[in-house]
A protein has these predicted regions:
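Intrinsically disordered, proline/Ser/Thr-rich N-terminal regulatory segments
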Residues: 207, 215-450, 454-517
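Beta-strand elements of modular eukaryotic interaction domains
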Residues: 6, 16-18, 31-35, 41-43, ...
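Short amphipathic alpha-helical segments embedded in low-complexity Lys/Glu-rich regions
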Residues: 42-49, 60-69, 103-111, 121-130, ...
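ATP/NTP phosphate-donor binding region
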Residues: 153, 157, 203, 207, ...
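ATP/nucleoside-binding phosphotransfer catalytic cores, i.e., glycine-rich phosphate-binding loops
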Residues: 237, 241, 247, 579, ...
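Surface-exposed beta-strand-to-loop junctions
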Residues: 3-11, 68-73, 133-139, 333-343, ...
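Cys/His-rich zinc-coordinating "finger" modules and their low-complexity flanking regions
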Residues: 1-319, 328-338, 345-347, 530, ...
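Catalytic core of DAGKc-family lipid kinases
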Residues: 607, 612-629, 634-661, 671-854
Length: 974
């Protein structure tokens, strides 16, 4: 095959060669089929990019071997769990994911095989780019392009033709605004991005800052897939002697690096960890063999692999491999340094037995995606006694061999006295991606900073205001701040001995010493005991942290929820506190700790109302995980919060300084009540005390969502993009809210409250106060609700389907029909007053007080208005409540089926009920048994601003984020 790399533009980095394809193959540039019998097109020998002869000079996709070097600000991906995925392509090797395990980024549309994960490019969306002192008018946001895996309805924004392909990885999509393009139209589109249709609710990255710490992004935003056993494995530590060869460390002068590694490890890992980290970056524990290069190797008792696979997986059958080894080609294991040998991690290359040293070296470099000059490297025989260098004329035949083992070689970096290093400007306002700085063994970091500042045109700035970091792009992004007297060339050479691949992925990063986030780092701490004093909370945290990790100040304390915010001015101390508190327990329950981002409100453009998204992943049908993943891709992930991590309070704290924003609550009626209750508690401390709230109904009943036209329940077929567009178009309305006061007669009797989310405040005179949004029930309705609640509490895993939940309700109702009726003659057990007048009750087994005209999953107990009706037409903002009665379980079923309505009893704005015995009650679906006493329902001073969905019909013509099943979604209005 003839190489054509010299004939094509070098900017893309591909190594193209002519190839004859024996099955239908498609061009990755124009997506047309390659026609012909032999040598139909070209293929990159590294990343498998296929291209027509006519498209060769129009290639814009960089090869995966150089893609990492093109990134100015690397951002690590947040990887999902390993799954089998259909109709997707790997962004590294460009092959289908169908038959192999793969992972994808939870923030962007980046998909890779598990075997290709080491070569994944750390180019996730940069979601926090705030720079102090930069004016909003000077901010220009650019597109963030992702190649391939486009939605099926994608059309090119330039030529308006379809740019979707099922045959290959092709086309581009902006991760911010969602526009899609052909590869050949990619260069002709303006680079400035305005976030597309979602601009009115998008939290712009230039308004967000996160502390400059080593805490991974997934730990900040609360990605669910990396918790429990995964986190336990990542932060577990073993014997440090297993990973360090101390004799070698002393010989190489690495004792200082070992001490630095241990010091840094104490900053990142919990106190319970006592062990190993690398002698070179990244300074975390050594990854296991299965985690490193994923060679799919099998091991004998002595630990030697029987076989390995090259990058991209070898599709040949065992028989074909055996025939090839007997033929003219040799399979050779390649280790890229001492670390790979120590962990027995290798790559396999296939070369002709008569290959020259140059050919073998080229194949070895290509296997590890090394793009540096081949003359800087050499190969040595692993099994030779003195590690002999390979030389012509027959290097393969001269290799030493061991019985039962393949020949193996070391890929080594030549020991030079001088060289060049790349210095990247990071977030400095520089147009160049990097500069080349010549270094020698005597060059220090301070010298390199001065040289880099001069090349970037910043020679007039003070060198002392800057720092230089060592950045590794191996399986994420790892940073180590360098001291001024360290020598960059020594770092490069030491890294070359340990791992050529790590040396290739290492870069020096110039940045200001001052953290753009500012001196204050906020930690949210939850799962503390509720209703303690500030001094008690302070003493408790000091005991957990110790005096050395004590916080600088205390932020808001949410006494009712047992949560608070603590402030640090030292980032290292904050990280130590984060992990120390995560290891701490109170009453056998781990504390919940989150490092919170910060939002600069002055950087939010006028007319933009950022959307704060809350998702309850445990609600009703449990579609929350799918939704939260889609919203993190469509929006800034720092505006999307999982209610399983601290509830609504962390998100409300982060948004407290924004003057105008909206809220989207994804959950059931109980979740909406939870968010509104938290808003009541923090509203007085926020710039926006009553943000408008929209709903994605995930619960079983979803009565408030029905009234506000958000639907009966999210099914998973709706396009998340259309849900967000509905929020933008929704109209604001006012929802009346009501205070329900319970005062029991027997002070010594304990009240049972079943759900903390609906818990009201309790005073010393045995009075409890709740806020009602939807309805309040006494009698048979509440009794049925209580039975369902108790069953779900006993076994929550059985109540993950909305349909099953409704089936359980029906089953329990049928049982109530044949059992003793606990609420019989309810009209004799209570006295009802409406607006100061006693109302005579008919013979009922339950009464329901309605604020909205939806109850029990969409039923309307009040019914339609008639001309001779003595009552006013009700709505949810008129300051009136409707009181209806039900005669039994059969009547409840008839109401839910639409055959009957409830008995209209009264209508008013102030209701008082006196109960003479223990009765089941429920407020907004949260039930318990209430002792005898007085119940007063009065209008609350707290009103909620809600968003009502506008009935707009849309055509499903815009590309969308695909659900996890890989299939396109439908419009919400279809």
């Amino acid at each position: 095959m003839a190489s054509v790399s010299a004939e094509t533009p070098a900017s893309h980095g591909h190594s193209f060669s002519k190839k004859t394809f024996h099955k239908p193959t498609y061009c990755h540039s124009c997506t047309d089929m390659l026609w012909g019998l032999i040598q139909q097109g070209y293929i990159c020998e590294v990343c498998n990019f296929v291209v027509h002869d006519r498209c060769l000079k129009a290639v814009v996709s960089p090869c995966s071997s150089i893609a990492a070097s093109l990134i100015k600000n690397p951002v690590a991906h947040c990887w999902s769990e390993q799954v089998h995925r259909k109709r997707k392509f790997c962004n590294v090797c460009r092959k289908r994911l169908d038959d192999n395990l793969s992972v994808h980024c939870e923030i962007c549309e980046y998909f890779v095989h598990v075997e290709c994960q080491d070569f994944a490019v750390a180019d996730c969306k940069e979601n926090a780019t705030y720079l102090p002192g930069k004016d909003l008018s000077a901010v220009k946001h650019t597109h963030h392009w992702r190649e391939g895996n486009l939605p099926s309805n994608s059309k090119c924004a330039l030529c308006k033709k379809s740019c979707f392909s099922t045959e290959c990885l092709s086309g581009f999509r902006c991760e911010w605004c969602g526009i899609t393009l052909h590869a050949y139209c990619y260069k002709n589109i303006p680079q400035e991005c305005t976030f597309g249709n979602l601009e009115p609710i998008y939290l712009p990255p230039h308004a967000v800052s996160i502390p400059r710490t080593e805490v991974p992004m997934e730990a900040i935003i609360g990605v669910q897939v990396r918790r429990k056993e995964v986190l336990a494995r990542e932060y577990s530590c073993h014997n440090i002697g297993e990973q360090f060869d101390f004799a070698e460390s002393e010989q190489n002068g690495a004792a200082g690096r070992l001490a630095e590694a241990l010091r840094r490890l104490s900053l990142v890992l919990p106190r319970s960890c006592h062990g190993n980290c690398h002698a070179s970056p990244p300074y975390v524990r050594a990854r296991s063999i299965s985690e490193e290069f994923n060679t799919d190797a099998r091991y004998r008792d002595n630990g030697e692999p029987v076989q390995g696979t090259a990058h991209g997986r070898d599709p040949r059958s065992p028989k074909e491999k055996e025939e090839k080894e007997r033929g003219d080609e040799e399979m050779i294991k390649v280790y890229d340094g001492n670390n790979s040998l120590r962990r027995r991690i290798f790559r396999v290359i296939s070369v002709p037995r008569q290959a020259t040293t140059e050919q073998v070296l080229t194949s070895a470099l290509r296997a590890f995606h090394i793009t540096k000059d081949p003359t800087d490297f050499y190969l040595t025989d692993l099994y030779a006694s003195d590690e002999t260098e390979l030389c012509d004329p027959t290097p393969i035949l001269n290799l030493n061999r061991k019985e039962g083992k393949r020949p193996a070689v070391f890929l080594r970096f030549k020991n030079k006295d001088s060289g060049e290093v790349r210095v990247y400007p990071g977030k400095l306002q520089i147009s160049e991606s990097f500069c080349i700085v010549p270094v020698t063994e005597a060059t220090t970091v301070a010298d390199s900073i001065n040289e880099a500042l001069e090349k970037f045109g910043l020679q007039n700035f003070n060198c002392d205001d800057y720092r230089c970091s060592e950045i590794l792009l191996d399986r994420g992004v790892t940073e180590r701040v360098l001291s001024w007297d360290e020598r960059p060339w020594d770092i490069v050479k030491q890294l070359g001995k340990d791992s050529i691949r790590q040396m290739e992925l290492m870069r020096f990063y110039l940045q200001l010493k001052q953290d753009p986030h500012g001196p204050n780092l906020a930690l949210f701490v939850g799962n503390l005991p509720p209703n303690l004093s500030e001094r008690s909370y302070e003493n408790m945290l000091t005991e957990f942290l110790g005096k050395e990790n004590r916080f600088s100040s205390i932020g808001p304390i949410y006494y009712e929820y047992g949560s608070m915010v603590i402030i640090y001015e030292d980032s290292n101390k904050a990280v130590r506190a984060l992990y120390a508190l995560r290891e701490s327990k109170y009453e056998d329950k781990h504390l919940l700790v989150m490092l919170l981002p910060s939002i600069e409100p002055s950087m939010v453009p006028a007319g933009v109302q950022p959307l704060l998204v809350f998702v309850n992943v445990k609600s009703g049908g449990c579609q929350g995980l799918q939704l939260i993943s889609s919203f993190r891709k469509l929006l800034n992930p720092y505006q999307v919060f999982d209610l399983d991590n601290g509830g609504p309070l962390p998100g409300l704290y982060v948004f407290r300084h924004i003057k105008d924003y909206k809220i989207l609550v994804c959950g059931g009626d109980g979740t909406i009540g939870w968010v509104l209750q938290c808003l009541d508690n923090v509203g007085q401390d926020s710039e926006c005390s009553s943000p408008a709230c929209a709903i994605v109904p995930l619960g079983t009943g979803n009565d408030l969502a029905r009234v506000l036209c958000w639907g009966s329940g999210y099914t998973g077929d709706e396009d998340p993009l259309n849900l967000l567009r509905d929020v933008i178009d929704a109209e604001e309305i006012i929802l009346d809210r009501w205070t329900v006061v319970f005062h029991t007669e027997e002070k010594e009797q304990t009240q049972v409250v079943c759900n903390a989310a609906g818990a009201g405040s309790t005073s010393e005179d045995n009075t409890q106060i709740y806020v009602m949004n939807n309805y309040f029930g006494i009698g048979v309705d509440a009794d049925l609700c209580l039975d369902f609640h108790n069953a779900r509490e006993e076994n929550p895993n059985k109540f993950k389907s909305r349909l099953r939940n409704k089936g359980v309700y029906v089953t329990m109702g049928l049982r109530k029909m044949v059992k003793r009726k606990p609420c019989k003659d309810l009209h004799r057990e209570i006295r009802l007053e409406v607006d100061g007048k006693v109302v005579e009750l008919p013979q009922v087994e339950g009464i329901i007080i309605l604020n909205i005209l939806s109850w029990g999953s969409g039923a309307n107990p009040w019914g339609a208005d008639t001309k001779e009706d003595q009552f006013y037409t009700p709505n949810h903002w008129d300051g009136m409540l409707e009181v209806v009665g039900v005669t039994g379980v059969i009547h409840l079923g008839q109401i839910q089926s639409g055959l009957r309505t409830a008995m209209r009893i009264a209508q008013g704005g102030h209701i008082k009920i006196h109960t003479y015995s223990d009765l089941p009650v429920q407020v907004d679906g949260e039930p318990w048994i209430q002792s005898p006493g007085d119940i007063v329902v009065l209008k609350s001073a707290l009103k909620a601003t809600m968003l009502k969905k506008s009935k707009i019909k849309r055509r499903n013509t815009e590309p969308s984020i695909l659900p996890s099943n890989g299939e396109g979604g439908k419009s919400t209005d279809e």
